[in-house]
Amino acid sequence: MFDITLVHAREILDSRGNPTVEAEVTLSGGAVGRAAVPSGASTGEHEAVELRDGDNARYLGKGVLKAVENVEGEIAQALGGMDASQQRDIDMRMLDLDGTENKGRLGANAILAVSMASARAVANQLDIPLYRYLGGVNGNILPVPMMNILNGGAHADNNVDFQEFMAMPVGAESFSEALRWGAEVFHTLKGVLKKRGYNTAVGDEGGFAPSLKSNVEAIEVILEAIQQAGYTPGEQIAIALDPAASEFFKDGKYIFKKSDKSEKTSEQMVRWWSDWANKYPIVSIEDGLAEDDWEGWKLLTDELGDKIQLVGDDLFVTNPERLARGIDNGVANSILIKVNQIGTLSETLDAIEMARRNGYTAVISHRSGETEDTFIADLAVATGAGQIKTGSASRTDRVAKYNQLLRIEEQLGAGARFLGIGALNYDGDLSAE
């Protein structure tokens, strides 16, 4: 019933109009699973390799026909007849076939598409939701959304150095209420920006991308929007940041090249984040320092690790080996989970499990180049991660994930759980913000 009879792939477009891989896996029982892979704009140096064609005559070199060919050729041949319900066997077969550390031969985009499609095919064959297949009876925790309502850095053409400013409705009682609060703040923010004379065009992830006067003003307009929407900053809706510091780190210095051109050392950046955490209702900072600035990360964790959530994205790249180094060195207290950073579902689940065993939280995340695929919504519930980062309340590629979570919440009914601030590694006093 679960034997793989056909593996097919095609080149489709992501939310930025760039090609990506979509795979379909057909089982002997008749079920078909389909999955599409996302891609990132600010990619970590240590991520698994996305295979691109490099043919400038097609899609400016970004085509993925080689990856598609690898799926329909080597991968399809290797997986034919295998039991798709044995996810780890499927993934290990593809890893062995690729034979590289970074999945660069077959392409992480080829491998991941098949890995996710296989899981979805089995869920479809069993006629159960994907989150239930992946998570069993424990799959009942709806995540707190990190809603990226203001964009800068590599995600926007403006003068804000930091990549993402997010609203987190940590005081809500349910996912649907949290989503409503976040959407209301997003729409209110549009009015705040318009009143100040700013453009309200949106960036890759659906957040606004105005040319603000400073990084501080980004925080200020969000706080104003939270209050205007009728909510209490900190107690009901807190702020999460993703500076993506690797993007402005060069030659051992952090260069604020988009704003005031100032340069900062690791120690000065730690002081910067400490000052902001004390001044504003910030509950989470992701990639506050560069991916290979391990000494700086240690300083940051010593300073803020027992107070707020410190998330490693480029630092860990969803890789259990890099996460193990962070755990051993007491660096960060949370990991961002992006399935295409590591390249298989099994390795993704391994990273989440390792984080959980060592007291780290896990935040399930999209990429800036997304598709309509809602796999990560089910993954968030299946793993009980408690947090999801999947953009703003605009752009269908982002909202698709939120809508899937609304459906899951409805399916779970009274069994649905929502942890709010309890989902984070946060030890501050929200009411005092």
Swiss-Prot record:
Active site: 205, 338
Cofactor(s) in the UniProt record: Mg(2+)
EC number per UniProt: 4.2.1.11
Cofactor binding remark: Binds a second Mg(2+) ion via substrate during catalysis.
Keyword tags: Cytoplasm, Glycolysis, Lyase, Magnesium, Metal-binding, Secreted
Places the protein is found: Cytoplasm; Secreted; Cell surface
Pathway stated in the Swiss-Prot or TrEMBL entry: Carbohydrate degradation; glycolysis; pyruvate from D-glyceraldehyde 3-phosphate: step 4/5
Pfam families noted in UniProt: Enolase_C, Enolase_N
UniProt superkingdom: Bacteria
Main EC class the enzyme belongs to: lyase
GO biological process: glycolytic process
Binding site for Mg(2+): 242, 286, 313
Binding site for (2R)-2-phosphoglycerate: 163, 338, 367-368, 389
Gene Ontology terms, MF aspect: magnesium ion binding; phosphopyruvate hydratase activity
GO cellular component, one term: cell surface
UniProt catalytic activity: (2R)-2-phosphoglycerate = phosphoenolpyruvate + H2O
Transmembrane segments: none
SMART domains: Enolase_C, Enolase_N
Family: Belongs to the enolase family.
NCBIfam families reported for this sequence: eno
Task of the protein: Catalyzes the reversible conversion of 2-phosphoglycerate (2-PG) into phosphoenolpyruvate (PEP). It is essential for the degradation of carbohydrates via glycolysis.
Protein name in the entry: Enolase
Protein species of origin: Koribacter versatilis (strain Ellin345)
Gene that this polypeptide is encoded by: eno
